[in-house]
Amino acid sequence: MDKKQREDSQKHEKFIHYADGSSLEEINNTVAIPKNAGFWKTLMAFMGPGALVAVGYMDPGNWITSIAGGAQFAYTLISVILVSNLIAMLLQAMAARLGIVTGMDLAQMTRAKTGKKMGIFLWIVTELAIMATDIAEIIGSAIALELIFNIPLLWGVLITAFDVLLLLLLMKLGFRKIEAIVATLVAVILFVFLYEVILAQPNMGDVVRGFVPSPRIMTDKKMLFLALGIVGATVMPHNLYLHSSIAQARQYDRDDVAEKRKAIKFTVIDSNIQLTIAFVVNCLLLILGAAMFYGTNSDLGRFVDLFNALQNKEIVGSIASPMLSLLFAVALLASGQNSTITGTLSGQIVMEGFVRMKIPLWARRVITRGLSILPVIIFTVYYHGNEAQVENLLIYSQVFLSIALPVSMIPLTLFTSDEKIMGPFVNRPWVKYTAWFVTIVLTLLNIYLILQTVGLAA
């Protein structure tokens, strides 16, 4: 046994060990890219990471906001979803470029530039954000299980704890298979809502006019608050760490500028395609809300309310059916399961990057899910399985996402605008100034949303 094999053997024997290598070593540089292939074949080889990133833009937390936006204000807020998606494309492209150019993910680069104490602080903040995301997915999955299989909410919450078994299976299949499974679940969500929107028969003229920003958005207080909710949820902090890492999964020459440029090109195309799908899903949700519920005065602030409304002919008319409700619940479950993968990978990335500590992925999942599931169980037991009260926890958990947002966006913009770090791949002036404008605006919006959530804003 040579020295490297002995080191690898000792590494696997330890439960916790020092992470001083490449980002997510399990998947880094593992996906082959065909040599001298054409555009489409090369693009297919790079497709995948974007799907994992897009999951964060169509999570259950966004569903309620989008459907409520349509139900209350018809198609007016489609323009807000469009602007939000363009912002997401910009920031995710920057995150991927940072990873490909430097060979470090955002957490590693932040730790390298700030030091150990700041690294620990940023790790704690980011872990809270990941837990907040996990809480939302636990609630979404548990409610979906209750709606589909009539499983009591508490049992549904406990069942979600065993998704670590799913993760173990997926990691054995390889990263390319994981990407394919996530993309399939995204497709399920897309086609469920596309089918339901086709049945709803929206006025396409009104839909198209919704892409043009309306002055009412700034003058109507309720509309403005919902618009802020849509924009404020645009960037999931952990997505920037995730993308800066998994963009390095492809095999390319790390020292060749032309190879890096090629990797950036195809990675950004993949990201933009998948984020466009997320944009379509969010538009479909808003259109569904407008076509089925606008003018009905229905309370659609909860998943259960939506589920019941889709089979109520007094609300949605003749197209109401249990099948519509079932498909909605299936899409909700698919969204929750996607987080099993992305949440765990993000958690591992920030742990390795900020505190340079590495544990097995299955253990990482058990710890994150264990900490996230406790408040959900407490809420569920205390409120006797009342879905409305449990969903309030989802709303409160989003505050942590808002707090963590500047922690990821500010370093990302700083690093990608630094020529010493990025070399010829540094942000162009228009990208730099746009990114800073977006960072400041989103940070202020999230502060306002936090104040609104806790009842302090006017």
From Swiss-Prot:
Primary localization: membrane
Any one GO biological process: iron ion transmembrane transport
Pfam families named in the record: Nramp (PF01566)
GO cellular component, as recorded: plasma membrane
Membrane topology annotation: Multi-pass membrane protein
PANTHER family recorded: NATURAL RESISTANCE-ASSOCIATED MACROPHAGE PROTEIN 2 (PTHR11706:SF33), SOLUTE CARRIER PROTEIN FAMILY 11 MEMBER (PTHR11706)
Family: Belongs to the NRAMP family.
Free-text function comment from the UniProt entry: H(+)-stimulated, divalent metal cation uptake system.
Protein name: Divalent metal cation transporter MntH
Organism: Latilactobacillus sakei subsp. sakei (strain 23K) (Lactobacillus sakei subsp. sakei)
Gene name of the encoded protein: mntH
